[in-house]
Amino acid sequence: MSTTISDSIASMISRINDIVITVAPSGDSNDSHRHSQIICDGGRTIQPLDDSSETTLAYADPNNPYLSNIDGDFRPIEQLSEEAAVEQATQLREAIREHDYQYYIRASPIIADRAYDILFDRLQALEDIFNLDTEASPTRRVGGEPLDELETVEHVTSMLSIDQSTAVDSVRDFDERVRDVVGDLEYICEPKFDGLSVEVIYEDGEYIRAATRGDGNRGDDVTAQVETVGAVPLKLHGDYPSYLAVRGEVYMPKAGFREYNRERIECDEKPFANPRNAAAGTLRQLDPGVVAERPLSCFFYDILDATELPPDQWTTLNDLQSWGLRTNDRISRVDSIDDAIAYRDQLKAARAELNYEIDGTVIKVNDRGNREILGATSRSVRWAFAYKFPPRAEITHITDIVVQVGRTGRLTPVALLDPVDVGGVTVSRASLHNPEEIKRLSVNSGDEVRVRRAGDVIPEVAEVTQKRATGTFNFPNQCPICHSSVEQDGPLAFCTGGLTCDAQLVRTIVHYGSRSALDIDGLGEQRVEQLVESGVIGELADLYTLSVADLSKLDGWGTTSAENLIQAISETQTPSLTDFLVGLGIPEVGPTIARNLAGTFDNFDAIIDADEAALREIEDIGPTVSTHISEFFTNEQNRAAIDNLLSAGVTPQTQQSTATTNAPLSDLTFVFTGSLSVPRTTATTYIERHGGNATGSVSSNTDYLVIGDNPGSTKRIDAERNDVPEIDETEFTELLAEHDDTLTWPP
């Protein structure tokens, strides 16, 4: 047997007690009776025997599905007592976690992949045969049962975005703003990963939940998917806090992406455009087993909440690493913005060498106290800035220019291109934005142009490199869909047809039923186009008068699919006021502003009647947004569409209207901190089910801060600042009984 194999397996079992592995000698692969034996004696002594040794202690079992085509096996499982199996499984879990830590965190694997697989397969066999599976077992990474759909969950604290720019002047402006408030400071500079941001929660060191960023307040529950990612530990390492919520970036390494796309092409499947799309698409798979087969990885870079928060970002990164949460090794601690700019330039030069995609750097204020002073808006933090790389660009030709009609009636010119690779993505269409941009570029079909991906995402025409066509594209004065007249609003052009324009109607209905609005399952764009083109739907309110007969006569519809859609639509007749406002498609009104509107006014009519001055008093609503809201509700076509929705039985529910005798906790807002007797998600669901609100951060609107074991300091400081009373779980139980003696805790 070769020294390399012997050394690898010796290392492999150095942490496992009283396990025997037999390995066929390399000299004669056909000799099934000659084995080298390696014994680990209580984890202390390793005794590899020479190649001439013979043993009958263990033989490869061709009927064992967990050990196929390998060089060795452990003692036959049927010879183990249940007690021995439990002990061996515990030892194997510890060994595999240690090897995961060495591989993902220290990047210094001490065993070969083949040897690791032997350990993993043995553990899986023990767990299946003796029913020993645990929540934190490494074998859970192979993926569980497929899900019916992705649930939406609320984050423990808002996952805010970061202001960004490719201009160095913007970076210096950020530095001046920060120093004006807090004076001298340190920055931590990190790569800006181009993947999918996730929140991961651990309780008592064990993996509990993972969710995508979503809108920053709520995201998709991807717990089953993320637990298959090898770089995400299911059990933390070292001296970890009892409660921990962290932020990381799931990504697909470049090498894995290339290999995965090669496999898709061989199977006649469409390849992914880039690693980010591949990672995002994979993580949203309903079958965790599919996720487990794809090459995802993860970097962690922030602590969102914990029983005790580190004093600064540098300590945060070191703590994450010590707990087995993989951090990036290209991080710098600097004193000046010049050094931060230099870091970005160095990272840009090294970008092609990295095995993961980045699109810039993130400059963060190091000290947590300074961060709290700087604060945040509802959208982004004020203590960090993303210095982006300039978008990649290539030269190609325009073959045609078409005009698209959006949901709000906005007309957008789009250049059709000879396909060109821009930063690893094949681009065949690029935005020309608006009529003014066409005039500025003096562009027409046939011209040679430079195309770039704005923000490394959206293709756009940057400039004409060679004029090959005569003149400039003539922008239409009629809508290309409904032929209504086109009106100019500054640099933008709009169709005046409103919801009588099929293009606007289709996009309006799709938006109304989207997950960020009323979340109508089965109401995708292709189905809506079919419903509009066939004349089954002529306006938004027609959704609520659809019948099985209407749908069954259309191609591709059966009785079951028709009944399912009608049921999904009927469940939205009493939407929350927030979701209804989002669904209406008011320009610039997303979930945050809709939530602020719903929380300020008593009912929907009050919002409709509010003047711009009253609207501007609301958080996050300035002159532009207030004008959009006011104009939307004074538009006759919009008012008619809303009246028809209300006549069809749609009744938006305010917080006040949902406060019934069956909602004993209505009007109460709770925040939890520390480890509770139940998972945080269970507590949140319980509060909401009984009419209350459970939020991730303390504000003046919070009624109670519920304190669990080992609570964090930030929420308690905020509670003291806002005069919010603190109660423990016992007092919380008593409070529930005061409101309704049928409420019990734990639920």
Curated annotation (Swiss-Prot):
Residue positions binding NAD(+): 113-117, 161-162, 190, 213, 249, 364, 388
Entry keyword set: DNA damage, DNA repair, DNA replication, Ligase, Magnesium, Manganese, Metal-binding, NAD, Zinc
Database matches in CDD domains: BRCT_DNA_ligase_like (cd17748), LIGANc (cd00114)
Disulfide bonds: none
Active site: 192
GO cellular component: cytosol
Catalytic activity: NAD(+) + (deoxyribonucleotide)n-3'-hydroxyl + 5'-phospho-(deoxyribonucleotide)m = (deoxyribonucleotide)n+m + AMP + beta-nicotinamide D-nucleotide
Pfam (any one): DNA_ligase_aden
Gene3D superfamilies in the cross-refs: 5' to 3' exonuclease, C-terminal subdomain, BRCT domain, DNA ligase/mRNA capping enzyme, Helix hairpin bin, Nucleic acid-binding proteins
GO molecular function, one term: metal ion binding
Listed GO biological process terms: DNA repair; DNA replication
Domain BRCT: 660-747
Keyword Lipoprotein on entry: no
InterPro entries linked to this entry: BRCT_dom, BRCT_dom_sf, DisA/LigA_HHH, DNA_ligase, DNA_ligase_CS, DNAligase_adenylation, DNAligase_N, NA-bd_OB-fold
EC number(s) reported in the record: 6.5.1.2
Binding-site list for Zn(2+): 479, 482, 495, 501
Cofactor: Mg(2+); Mn(2+)
Highest taxon of the lineage: Archaea
Record family assignment: Belongs to the NAD-dependent DNA ligase family. LigA subfamily.
Function summary: DNA ligase that catalyzes the formation of phosphodiester linkages between 5'-phosphoryl and 3'-hydroxyl groups in double-stranded DNA using NAD as a coenzyme and as the energy source for the reaction. It is essential for DNA replication and repair of damaged DNA.
Protein name, as recorded: DNA ligase
Lineage: Archaea, Methanobacteriati, Methanobacteriota, Stenosarchaea group, Halobacteria
